[in-house]
């Protein structure tokens, strides 16, 4: 593991790799957040948001002390204030390295995951693991908010364009808007990433048609999930001047992992972590 954060092009993305089934934390590939934050004028020493990247690992498996396979669903919470994010394919390869690794128990596994991921991210990563007897409690729900996807608009731009965002300064509101039409593409491979996004704010009333066009504008944009959400947050904050703003996206899984970035200037943490139907 190179914690000096190499560039995405050096990651396992788009490359043929061998799958290791014995524990190997060196598979993790951290990437500095600041490089992409520079593009949107954000300094990690003075972030305009708090936040967390919630990852769900649906394909976690290991061996118990007697060699019997075990499974679980893991939730990882990586602080947005960490200097590094973790590239998703390397994350998958790292989790796969537990497949033939014996662990003394669920607590030991969670502690080891947290230790390795915290070292990679440069900040404390919280880990929880749901065992099969808890799977029945898993539920599905859509993101909160009024969906704007049925607005009858014409669209001819498929790149982020914050200039089209606008808000009515004579109408101050508190509302939550959401869309299931968020699509971006992997920064390295160009593979499509599908998501839903919720925007909760207090401030001048945002033009909904303009917001929907703006979100659709990510359709040909190549960036990691976390970077897209931070770009949305910063663009809406600057163009529409809300006093309170929370942006929360939930992306469909790839390689057994989904990524759900959450950014806010008014809340300490997301109130829920419920997967959507597409997840």
UniProtKB/Swiss-Prot annotation:
Tree of life domain: Bacteria
Subcellular localization: Cytoplasm
Documented EC number(s): 1.7.1.13
Primary residence: cytoplasm
Active site (UniProt): 186 (thioimide intermediate), 193 (proton donor)
UniProt KW keywords: Cytoplasm, NADP, Oxidoreductase, Queuosine biosynthesis
NADP among keywords: yes
Name of the featured protein: NADPH-dependent 7-cyano-7-deazaguanine reductase
GO cellular component: cytoplasm
One function term, GO molecular function aspect: preQ1 synthase activity
Catalytic reaction annotation: 7-aminomethyl-7-carbaguanine + 2 NADP(+) = 7-cyano-7-deazaguanine + 2 NADPH + 3 H(+)
Residues noted as binding substrate in the record, renumbered to the chain: 86-88, 225-226
Family to which the UniProt record says this protein belongs: Belongs to the GTP cyclohydrolase I family. QueF type 2 subfamily.
Single biological process term from Gene Ontology: queuosine biosynthetic process
Signal sequence bounds: none
The protein's annotated pathway: tRNA modification; tRNA-queuosine biosynthesis
Subunit relationships: Homodimer.
